[in-house]
Swiss-Prot record:
N-acetylserine modified-residue sites: S2
GO MF term set: cyclin-dependent protein serine/threonine kinase regulator activity
Transmembrane stretches, start-end: none
Organism: Saccharomyces cerevisiae (strain ATCC 204508 / S288c)
Function statement: Essential for the control of the cell cycle at the G2/M (mitosis) transition. Interacts with the CDC2 protein kinase to form MPF. G2/M cyclins accumulate steadily during G2 and are abruptly destroyed at mitosis.
A single GO BP: G1/S transition of mitotic cell cycle
Name by which UniProt lists this protein: G2/mitotic-specific cyclin-2
Any further remark recorded for this protein: Present with 339 molecules/cell in log phase SD medium.
Compositionally biased residues, Polar residues: 67-77
Assigned keywords, A-Z: Acetylation, Cell cycle, Cell division, Cyclin, Mitosis
Keyword Cell cycle: yes
Length: 491
């Protein structure tokens, strides 16, 4: 038989321990001012624990303040623990006072309160005290002072930090800016650019002829412009243009070569424009043709085969995607077969010893355009004027660099630009206005003469080339009619 007194004590101990656990959970979750049930109001163990909590509340917070004096924190915790034991209250092992993380908060992280479910607060993932300024308010706050105020501060601070993470960073930056307010800062961050270096060119007597600027210095960081080697490259091209220059007197061994060449070149311009090939392809094709005709005597009925084979060779040399030999054969209307074009290709290459290293005039024109600020109108007009030296028989034997310089000089005159200055002289290869005069007059004569190469003029009448042929012819007729000197015009 069980003793009724022992049963009563066991039941009281069971109910008091259960109630004690509830109170401890609420106290650890920052819940105070709890309303106790009337049925358990007279419980002596609960009354003792409540009085103990009130005494602790008067002495200070149960949660130790985060200071660097770890000895005082551990001493206060031990005294509070001893007080609870003297009153007959057994604390669980996972009590806040026995938690190792809270005994040394300076080296640990504190979990912020993020959600409240069924009157129970949850302490989730770690949030560093050094990362969040609002966490300090949570730790320093007394958990036994008001449920509403403590919970709202914790919840709002964490939510604001999640929704507006930039605000906390902005506060830190503002604090840093206040500390750095005494530092001097630069007034302007504009970096001054160095002006191009200028060089002077003098004659044999030491008299200054012209002054030019080093425009290649601005392309030092551009690997495609190869500014380190550009002077050596064009020096080599000027040497090479003399070697690959056809001779006009060698072409006179053919009968009626002047008229026949005009017809053939006009047809090649048509095919070249129809296939949409590069300008370099046409220049190389006609250079190969003139050099070949200067070495070999060709019958009149085979002249079209020579022109077709030369254009086929040039397209394979210059183009990325060259038209097939079938396309070239179809443009001759049966005058040349595919096998004949192949045989002509082999014979021409053997005659020229496979030397196709021709300094294209477009390279010299692009070089001069650098001194002209790469003006698109000047270069488009210059391309039309430069191509005149390709189709007109009188220009055979003139250096491509000289023709390119004369074309740029004439295009600038048409647009009313300034004089031929030192930069233009240097980047054209050193051609002065006096050296350009004969070639410029030849271009003027072609513009005012009746049209012979209709396909060539029709090509440059399109909007793609800004109607360069129409503008040039009208300008030349007006200048010739009024008797203006093209070499001193607009100066």
């Amino acid at each position: 038989m069980s003793n009724p007194i022992e049963n009563t004590e066991n039941s009281q101990n069971t109910s008091s321990s259960r109630f004690l656990r509830n109170v401890q959970r609420l106290a650890l979750n920052n819940v105070t001012n709890t309303t106790f049930q009337k049925s358990n109001a007279n419980n002596p163990a609960l009354t003792n624990f409540k009085s103990t909590l009130n005494s602790v509340k008067k002495e200070g917070s149960r949660i130790p303040q985060f200071t660097r004096e770890s000895v005082s924190r551990s001493t206060a915790a031990q005294e509070e623990k001893r007080t609870l034991k003297e009153n007959g209250i057994q604390l669980p092992k996972n009590n806040l006072l026995d938690d190792k993380e809270n005994q040394d908060p300076s080296s640990q992280q504190f979990g912020a309160l993020t959600s409240i479910k069924e009157g129970r607060a949850e302490l989730p993932a770690n949030i560093s005290l050094q990362e969040s300024s609002s966490a300090k308010e949570i730790i320093q706050h007394d958990p036994l002072k008001g449920v509403g105020s403590s919970t709202e501060v914790v919840h709002n601070s964490v939510e604001n930090e999640k929704l507006h993470p930039a605000r906390s960073q902005l506060q830190v930056r503002n604090t840093e800016s206040e500390t750095d307010s005494g530092k001097k800062r630069p007034i302007s961050t504009i970096v001054e650019q160095e002006l191009p270096k200028k060089f002077k060119v003098c004659d044999e007597n030491g008299k200054e002829e012209y002054e030019w600027e080093d425009l290649d210095a601005e392309d030092v960081n551009d690997p495609f412009m190869v500014s380190e080697y550009v002077n050596d490259i064009f020096e080599y091209l000027h040497q090479l243009e003399v070697i690959t220059l056809p001779k006009k007197e060698d072409l006179y061994q053919h009968r009626n070569i002047h008229q026949n060449r005009d017809i053939l070149v006009n047809w090649l311009v048509k095919i070249h424009n129809k296939f949409g090939l590069l300008p370099e392809t046409l220049y190389l094709a006609i250079n190969i043709m003139d050099r070949f005709l200067g070495k070999e005597l060709v019958q009149l009925d085979k002249l079209q085969l020579v022109g077709t084979s030369c254009l086929f060779i040039a397209s394979k040399y210059e183009e990325v995607y060259s038209p097939s030999i079938k396309h070239f054969a179809s443009e001759t209307d049966g005058a040349c077969t595919e096998d004949e074009i192949k045989e002509g290709e082999k014979f021409i290459l053997k005659t020229l010893k496979f030397n196709l290293n021709y300094p294209n005039p477009m390279n010299f024109l692009r070089r001069i355009s650098k001194a002209d600020d790469y003006d698109i109108q000047s270069r488009t007009l210059a391309k039309f004027l430069l191509e005149i030296s390709l189709v007109d028989f009188r220009f055979i034997g003139i250096l491509p660099s000289l023709c390119a310089a004369a074309a740029m000089f004439m295009s600038r005159k048409m647009l009313g630009k300034g004089k031929w200055d030192g930069n233009l002289i240097h980047y054209s290869g050193g051609y002065t206005k006096e050296e350009l005069a004969p070639v410029c007059h030849m271009i003027m004569d072609y513009l005012v003469s009746p049209i012979v190469h209709d396909e060539f003029h029709r090509k440059y009448q399109s909007r793609r080339f800004m109607k360069a042929s129409i503008i040039s012819v009208q300008w030349a007729l007006k200048v010739r009619k009024n008797g203006y000197d093209i070499m001193t015009l607009h100066e």
